[in-house]
């Protein structure tokens, strides 16, 4: 069957089929391509709004954009809408889709639009946010809404969709404004793709790090402490400590020096850096001795001051500082999400001060570091370079040198990468590291950022080989991004079944009776000397219940100890990953776990 054209692509702009006058544009067919799904999902958001309007005539709508993997619409309605109402909204959407309603577009002036929607305060809000000029309106049946589009030409294209959840959302993301209802959904071009996506969604619910974090006793949150401030429990703290230890060793082997800057800096420092003018709303400030101080949202200023603490020569470069830096950033309560979006987090942060000629060499080394670490946790990854934006500091030559160095480093490593033209920060180009988890979801984690700005603002210098003062380039580099976010991603990636070398509790030791506890404690001590955490299940419970408790904690290994094991100094091993049970001497078991720990190599 021949695919139908639903829109056209003009460079990177998607245009409605009905708006096209130039027939030389690239056709967008009705399929699951990125461009097609954007049109389908945008249209499906309007289909949902039309269904809601039919069911709740008093409903008023704010905005309904396409997001990654779907869409949402924010609206006001008198009735309280819950998850149970999604079924009837979906049913109405299907009726409208089956009715094959033509979707048309027309344009009016902004003033005409303000008059047309004069009794709709939410539409007035939308119109106040857009520039003067022509305003486009999409119409399907009796339903009309403001929208830039594009949309499919007919509701018949909107058959394979699912409404996924209901939430609250502040008007315009402003916590001081009213709370609107938000419904999320997704849509595809065919039934199979929708079914596959919904299967992944169900699996993602089981793997949700917030759910597993509670079940595995990794972390918690407390309203009396405050939103976005994670509390690490013993298991989570052990997991995090193991990750920190691995990273520390890799950093040291790669020539990084550990440093630590203060968490509180005078506002003057943030004024020099530009954070005060450009990032103040995301920071926390306080007064000490009638002077203003800011809690750091980033670690770079502290590292700059460490660079400035000594006279630097070209022979000293590159200088590589790293820190597990605790930072605080003000996030609106509505966007806080488990460990993924918090107000306090710890970055695996490093700053490299080097000469422009050393950028490529340093980026190559960072890429090797990234590859090493991602393979360790079984993540695939991809890269994206963001280039010079319209507004930028630094001359074209230094931008060209830096961007070329990033591209050459990626090419030399044989890594595929995308290019976000003009998407760089004003102070330098960057590489974004995006990892793919077991559910094929992509996560933005690390960044390699070239910076000409801060060295200039703080007047950093080194003495060159010709005895002249030169300004170094600064590379900001985080591989995990933050420990919190990465641990959240890792928890979902492995469904809480952490690799042996990083598991908070790697071995569960189950003595059958009281007579076997002493031997269990002996094994526990021996494992601890190998930096392997274990737990002895010594409660007065049945053997099956003890084993079940250990299995619920998703421990990599469980040892069962009875009279025979005590007498022979052996263990009955249950290996979760290998899905096998076997008897080993204690010496053989210790050899086995040593081998597992040695799998972590750099």
From Swiss-Prot:
Binding sites annotated in the UniProt record for Zn(2+): 300, 351, 476
SUPFAM superfamilies: Class II aaRS ABD-related, Class II aaRS and biotin synthetases, ThrRS/AlaRS common domain
Pfam families noted in UniProt: HGTP_anticodon (PF03129), tRNA-synt_2b (PF00587), tRNA_SAD (PF07973)
GO cellular component, one term: cytosol
UniProt keyword terms in alphabetical order: Aminoacyl-tRNA synthetase, ATP-binding, Cytoplasm, Ligase, Metal-binding, Nucleotide-binding, Protein biosynthesis, RNA-binding, tRNA-binding, Zinc
GO biological process: threonyl-tRNA aminoacylation
Cofactor: Zn(2+)
Keyword Magnesium on entry: no
Reactions catalysed, as given in the entry: tRNA(Thr) + L-threonine + ATP = L-threonyl-tRNA(Thr) + AMP + diphosphate + H(+)
Subcellular localization, as worded in the UniProt entry: Cytoplasm
InterPro entries, per database record: aa-tRNA-synt_IIb (IPR002314), aa-tRNA-synth_II (IPR006195), aa-tRNA-synth_II/BPL/LPL (IPR045864), Anticodon-bd (IPR004154), Anticodon-bd_dom_sf (IPR036621), Thr-tRNA-ligase_IIa (IPR002320), Thr/Ala-tRNA-synth_IIc_edit (IPR018163), ThrRS_anticodon (IPR047246)
The protein's enzyme class: ligase
Domain of life: Bacteria
The keyword Metal-binding appears for this protein: yes
Subunit note: Homodimer.
Protein family according to the UniProt entry: Belongs to the class-II aminoacyl-tRNA synthetase family.
Function in brief: Catalyzes the attachment of threonine to tRNA(Thr) in a two-step reaction: L-threonine is first activated by ATP to form Thr-AMP and then transferred to the acceptor end of tRNA(Thr). Also edits incorrectly charged L-seryl-tRNA(Thr).
Official protein name in the record: Threonine--tRNA ligase
Gene giving rise to this polypeptide: thrS
């Amino acid at each position: 069957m021949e695919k139908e054209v639903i829109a056209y692509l003009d460079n990177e702009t998607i245009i409605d089929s009905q708006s096209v006058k130039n027939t030389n544009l690239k056709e967008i067919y009705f399929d699951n391509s990125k461009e097609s799904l954007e049109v389908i999902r945008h249209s499906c958001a309007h289909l949902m709004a039309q269904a809601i309007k039919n069911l709740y005539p008093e409903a008023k709508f704010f905005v309904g954009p396409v997001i990654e993997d779907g869409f949402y619409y924010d609206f006001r309605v008198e009735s309280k809408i819950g998850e149970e109402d999604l079924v009837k909204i979906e049913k109405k959407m299907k009726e409208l889709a089956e009715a094959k309603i033509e979707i048309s577009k027309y344009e009016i002036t902004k003033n005409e639009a303000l008059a047309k929607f004069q009794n709709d305060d939410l539409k007035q809000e939308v119109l106040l946010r857009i520039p003067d000029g022509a305003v486009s309106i999409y119409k399907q049946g009796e339903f009309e809404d403001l929208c830039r589009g594009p949309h499919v030409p007919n509701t018949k294209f909107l058959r394979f969709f699912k409404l996924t959840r209901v939430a609250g959302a502040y008007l315009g993301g402003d916590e001081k404004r009213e709370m609107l209802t938000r419904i999320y959904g997704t849509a595809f071009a065919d039934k199979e793709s929708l079914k596959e996506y919904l299967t992944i969604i169900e699996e993602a619910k089981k793997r949700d790090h917030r759910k597993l974090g509670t079940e595995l006793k990794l972390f918690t949150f407390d309203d009396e402490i405050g939103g976005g401030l994670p509390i690490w429990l013993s298991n989570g703290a052990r997991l995090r400590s193991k990750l920190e230890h691995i990273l520390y060793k890799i950093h040291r082997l790669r020539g990084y020096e550990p440093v630590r800057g203060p968490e509180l800096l005078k506002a003057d420092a943030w004024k020099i850096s530009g954070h005060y003018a450009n990032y103040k709303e995301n920071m926390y400030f306080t007064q000490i001795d009638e002077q203003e101080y800011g809690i750091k949202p980033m670690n770079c200023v502290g590292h700059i001051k460490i660079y400035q603490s000594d006279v630097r020569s070209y022979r000293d470069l590159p200088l590589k500082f790293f820190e597990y830096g605790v930072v605080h950033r003000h996030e609106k309560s509505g966007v806080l999400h488990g460990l993924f979006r918090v107000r306090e987090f710890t970055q695996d942060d490093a700053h490299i001060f080097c000469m422009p000629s050393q950028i490529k060499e340093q980026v190559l080394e960072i890429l090797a570091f990234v590859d090493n670490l991602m393979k360790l946790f079984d993540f695939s990854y991809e890269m994206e370079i963001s280039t010079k934006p319209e507004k930028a500091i630094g001359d074209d030559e230094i931008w060209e040198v830096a961007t070329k160095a990033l591209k050459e480093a990626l090419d030399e490593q044989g890594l595929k990468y995308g290019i976000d033209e003009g998407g760089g920060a004003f102070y330098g180009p960057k590489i974004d590291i995006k990892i793919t988890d077991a559910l094929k979801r992509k996560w933005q984690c690390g960044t390699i950022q070239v910076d000409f700005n801060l060295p200039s603002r703080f007047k950093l210098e080194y003495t060159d080989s010709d005895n002249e003062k030169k300004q170094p380039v600064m590379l900001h580099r985080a591989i995990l991004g933050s420990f919190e976010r990465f641990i959240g991603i890792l928890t979902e990636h492995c469904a809480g079944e952490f690799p042996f070398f990083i598991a908070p509790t790697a071995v569960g030791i189950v003595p059958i009776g009281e007579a076997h506890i002493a031997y269990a404690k002996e094994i526990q001590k021996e494992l601890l000397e190998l930096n392997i955490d274990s737990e002895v299940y010594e409660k007065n419970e049945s053997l099956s219940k003890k084993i079940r408790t250990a299995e619920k904690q998703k421990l990599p290994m469980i040892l069962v100890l009875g009279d025979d094991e005590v007498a022979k100094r052996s263990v009955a091993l249950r290996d979760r990953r290998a899905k096998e049970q076997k008897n080993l001497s204690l010496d053989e078991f210790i050899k086995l776990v040593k081998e597992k720990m040695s799998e972590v190599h750099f």
